[in-house]
């Protein structure tokens, strides 16, 4: 495995670990805290912010980044918008979309590097 392939593999594993930690927050957070507006930040809105940022980070080109639209809009980015509620199911579905997008991106990068490695290994 080349150094580049190893870096992509490590980055993929770390990205997956970060998504797993986010999933743990969604699954393990008690319902009474999930939409609790008595604190500085609302957990469901904070998780949405994390997911939208993760989704944005998977954009492959500047054009994709420039035209990026957050799945559920901007209002969840205030962290304390009583009009914006995100259910656990809603954010779990979004997380699954991001996982699939990340898997596709990292698999494509790995495949491209394998082809490059094979080409460079030719006599």
Which role fits each region the language model picked out?
Residues 1-10, 53-122:
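Short, helix-capping/interhelical loops that line the mouth of catalytic, cofactor-
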Residues 19-22:
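Conserved PLP-dependent catalytic core of the aminotransferase class-I/II
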Residues 34-43, 120-123:
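A glycine-rich, coil/turn loop motif that links secondary-structure elements
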Residues 49:
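Histidine-centered divalent metal-coordination motifs
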């Amino acid at each position: 495995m080349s150094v580049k392939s190893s870096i992509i593999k490590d980055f993929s594993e770390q990205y997956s670990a970060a998504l797993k930690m986010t999933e743990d927050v969604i699954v393990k957070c008690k319902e009474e805290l999930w939409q609790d507006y008595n604190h500085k930040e609302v957990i469901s809105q904070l998780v949405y912010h994390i997911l939208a940022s993760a989704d944005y980070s998977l954009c492959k080109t500047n054009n994709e980044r420039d035209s990026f639209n957050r799945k559920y809009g901007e209002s969840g980015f205030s962290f304390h918008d009583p009009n914006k509620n995100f259910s656990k199911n809603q954010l779990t579905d979004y997380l699954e979309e991001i996982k699939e997008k990340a898997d596709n991106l990292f698999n494509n990068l790995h495949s491209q590097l394998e082809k490059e490695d094979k080409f460079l290994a030719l006599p």
